[in-house]
Amino acid sequence: MISSRYSLPVIFLLILALLPTIIHSYLGSEYDDGRSVQTIPTTLAGFSSEPYLRHKDQWVKSLYGSEDWIERIYKNDNGEKIRLFAARSYDYKKLYHHPELGLSHGSNLKEEGIVMLPGDPEIPVFVLRSSSGSGIDAYVLLHEGKFIKDPVSHQIKDAFTQLFQTRKAMTLFYVSDTTAPIADNFKKTSSASILTTAIQSFNANETTGVEN
């Protein structure tokens, strides 16, 4: 039998242990903030687009845990073609853990590092270059209105908070240009322009959150 002097601390610890279950089972485990990548315009930075039909809903859901996604080829009058993929998921690791392995399979990409694009705040972009001599891929991660520079560290720091709050979607913005010269400064590429304007248009959406 528990001594009366320990009863209150024990009750407190039991309530604390049950809180995550209560939150996720009864109040909903996911928070829909009302945003969608579907609102990203089909024309960006002077490029018009058409759907990229290679990847299907089930493939994207399986690989990236997303049911809200787009994939388009943006073209301009000079013949440039930029592929944009954007997706939202509550499974953060599926988005941040080498997204290029699925989206640019077989391209033999090497990580170049993080490039900061101008903005308020600046946008950290993970840049990858093809070892073939041409081709640039790049992606940005966004969570709760903040850009993620170190996704692993971010998830570790966020792990405790997630026990007591409903999960909020992370957004991946991914661009690929298979013909960009290897020596191009990423900041001056069309890929950077497409990426920046896609993010700006997404962030401009008003939100009305709902717990699921």
Residue ranges, per PLM feature:
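General structural signal for secondary-structure boundaries
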Residues: L13, L18, D32-G34, L53-D57
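Short, solvent-exposed recognition patches
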Residues: S48-T161
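Membrane-embedded transmembrane-helix bundle of lipid-linked glycan/lipid transferases
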Residues: M1-S3
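A short, solvent-exposed beta-edge/loop patch
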Residues: R5-Y26, I114-N212
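Hydrophobic/aromatic-rich, well-ordered segments within soluble, folded domains that form packed cores
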Residues: P41, S48-E50, V175
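Alpha-helical transmembrane signal-anchor/signal-peptide segments
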Residues: Y26-G46
